[in-house]
Each structure stands twice: as structure tokens, then as C-alpha cells.
């Protein structure tokens, strides 16, 4: 049964960050930056500070050292000439910084730890299915893995879309580590901000670069709007959280923002269930960050499999519905 119109009309944004040190990106265009500001990426140099000279030199000040907040160590905004820094999420609604979490459609945050080297169904509906592949690191002092999302496998109609982060030893933000395929064929996009790829098989689907490397926006008209960015675990992240990152693997993973249109009231999955009109949050909301269990219900046999216990994909002829909405 379809969700009531009042619910369908309100497009919910789900921000996804999994069980390590991810901050999620907004699934909506960024508004213009404030005047006299610069975005810096000190994380690529393995530290949170960066020396810069602001464009406005009338005050004849010496170059200042800008320090990104620990909520956003790899990217932040510097206001000139004060050299004060802010996380981008302080300016852009819908973005999230800080502790790893899912943010459900009901507005509540929760962890889903999952397990490394396994796939889990994040959203499963009649005409849309999204799995996430987890990578991880085991800390001997803990009973679970540190986990991150390395890739998404998206099924709609008879198509398969793969969005992934390539395994990377030494991180270089100027090298593109995105891996994108549609129905098994590579998606190649010119390395310029705003460059766009459009599917010939599904013209309503576009992939647009949001940065010259490692960031894209994937849109399927009337179905979803996804922002992804490949990021590493930095030495600082590893030191603070005891991730024990080694030189042979920077644990490159995805920061993800989801925006969905027209999910039905039968939707399920780790996140999908929070969109149901009858969803009841049974997590311990008094905890600093509730943890969703029930891993067995969400395990998929591979990145594109629709065999998790709560799968809804293809039910009630829904596979053809997405094509109609996208045209």
C-alpha cells in the first residue's frame, strides 16, 4: 500500500555514516559560500592545520594558520581575514558532522555496526533496493568490528548501479578513487566540477561531479538523489579512535547522503523501515547513541542480492513502477 500523500509530499533526507569516523554529505545542492571565504583540505597532509593567505590583503596581515575542527578534520571553511574556521555542516542544512550514525526518517540517530566484509540491505522497497558493503577493522580489545561503508549496490527496474571506493594504500585527495558502474559498464566522467554523465538506457539518471575527484551526485528523477564522497581514515582519526590503520590500507570509504522520493509504506531495510508510517522506534533512545541490532535480518549474500530477510524488491509488480516515475 502506498504511503499517504501527506507523507509522500514531504521528502525526507537520510544521512548515512557507519560505525567509525564518517561524516555525511547533504543530498541537496550547496548554497554559495559566504563572501571572503575559502575551503581548505588539511586532512590530505595528515594534519588539521594549514597556512594560508586570505585574498583580502588590505589589512596587510601575515599569513594565518587555520585549524579545522575535530568534527571535520579533512575539510572546513575559513573566513577571511579573521581566519576563523567552520565545518561545512555549520553552513549547509542537511549535512552532519561528528559521531558516526544513521539518521532515520523519524529524525532519530542510531548505530548499526554490522560486520566487515559483508553486505546489508539499507533500503528495500517494491521498486528500489540498496545494499551496502561494509569494510572494517578489528580491535582486539573490542568484541565487534569498526565498520565503514565501502560501496553501494543499487537495484531498480532491471538495472544495477554500483558506487564504490577503491582500496587505497596511501591516500592522495588529488587522485580519484571512485569506482562507478551501470549495468556492469564503467561510468566515465571528465574530472571537472559539474561534468555530467547521462544514461542512454535510463535518461532520467545522471551522475554529476561535485568535486574534481572523489565526489559525485547521482540522481534518478522521481526516485532518489544520492551524494557520495570517498574519504580515508586519517592518521589522526586512527590515533584518536584506536583504529590501528596500517600503511597498506587507508580504509577508503564513502560519506553518503540520501534523498528519496515516493517510497511505499511497505519499505524496509536498516534505514528504509524508518520511513513507514507505522514505524515504532524500539531502540534505547536514552542511550547516548542507540544501537540497532538484528543483523541477521539485513544480511544480503552479495552487493546486488535482494535476498535479505526483509527484502521487498519486486513485490507487487513494483519493478516497473520506478521506470514510470523516472520518465
Where are the language model's segments positioned?
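Secreted, short cysteine-rich peptides and small extracellular cysteine-rich domains stabilized by multiple disulfide
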Residues: 46-91
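Context-dependent free N-terminus signature
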Residues: 2-3
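Low-complexity, Pro/Ser/Thr-rich intrinsically disordered segments
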Residues: 26-53, 323
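Cleavable N-terminal signal peptides of Sec/SRP-targeted secreted and luminal proteins
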Residues: 6-25
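Von Willebrand factor type D
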Residues: 90-327
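Intrinsically disordered, low-complexity segments used for protein-protein interactions
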Residues: 10-16, 31, 35-38, 42-43, ...
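Intrinsically disordered, low-complexity eukaryotic regions enriched in glycine, serine
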Residues: 44-46, 58-59, 184-185, 191-192
Amino acid at each position: 500500500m502506498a504511503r499517504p500523500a501527506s507523507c509522500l509530499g514531504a521528502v525526507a533526507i537520510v544521512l548515512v555514516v557507519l560505525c567509525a569516523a564518517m561524516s555525511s554529505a547533504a543530498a541537496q545542492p550547496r548554497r554559495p559560500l559566504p563572501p571572503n571565504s575559502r575551503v581548505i583540505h588539511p586532512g590530505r597532509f595528515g594534519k588539521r592545520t594549514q597556512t594560508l593567505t586570505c585574498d583580502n590583503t588590505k589589512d596587510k596581515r601575515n599569513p594565518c594558520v587555520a585549524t579545522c575542527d575535530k568534527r571535520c578534520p579533512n575539510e572546513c571553511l575559513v573566513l577571511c581575514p579573521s581566519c576563523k574556521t567552520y565545518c561545512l555542516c555549520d553552513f549547509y542544512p542537511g549535512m552532519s558532522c561528528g559521531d558516526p550514525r544513521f539518521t532515520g526518517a523519524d529524525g532519530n540517530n542510531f548505530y548499526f555496526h554490522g560486520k566487515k566484509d559483508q553486505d546489508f540491505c539499507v533500503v528495500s522497497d517494491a521498486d528500489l533496493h540498496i545494499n551496502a558493503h561494509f569494510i572494517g577493522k578489528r580491535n582486539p580489545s573490542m568484541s565487534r568490528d569498526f565498520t565503514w561503508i565501502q560501496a553501494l549496490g543499487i537495484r531498480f527496474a532491471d538495472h544495477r548501479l554500483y558506487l564504490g571506493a577503491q582500496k587505497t594504500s596511501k591516500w592522495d585527495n588529488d587522485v580519484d578513487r571512485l569506482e562507478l558502474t551501470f549495468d556492469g559498464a564503467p561510468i566515465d566522467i571528465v574530472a571537472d566540477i559539474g561534468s555530467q554523465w547521462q544514461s542512454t538506457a535510463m535518461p532520467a539518471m545522471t551522475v554529476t561531479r561535485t568535486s574534481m575527484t572523489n565526489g559525485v551526485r547521482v540522481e534518478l528523477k522521481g526516485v532518489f538523489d544520492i551524494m557520495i564522497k570517498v574519504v580515508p581514515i586519517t592518521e589522526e582519526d586512527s590515533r584518536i579512535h584506536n583504529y590501528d590503520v596500517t600503511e597498506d590500507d587507508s580504509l577508503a570509504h564513502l560519506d553518503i547522503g540520501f534523498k528519496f522520493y515516493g517510497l511505499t509504506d511497505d519499505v524496509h531495510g536498516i534505514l528504509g523501515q524508518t520511513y513507514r508510517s507505522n514505524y515504532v522506534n524500539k531502540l534505547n533512545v536514552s542511550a547516548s547513541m542507540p544501537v540497532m541490532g538484528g543483523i541477521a535480518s539485513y544480511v544480503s549474500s552479495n552487493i546486488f542480492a535482494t535476498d535479505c530477510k526483509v527484502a521487498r524488491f519486486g513485490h507487487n509488480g513494483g519493478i516497473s513502477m520506478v521506470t514510470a516515475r523516472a520518465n
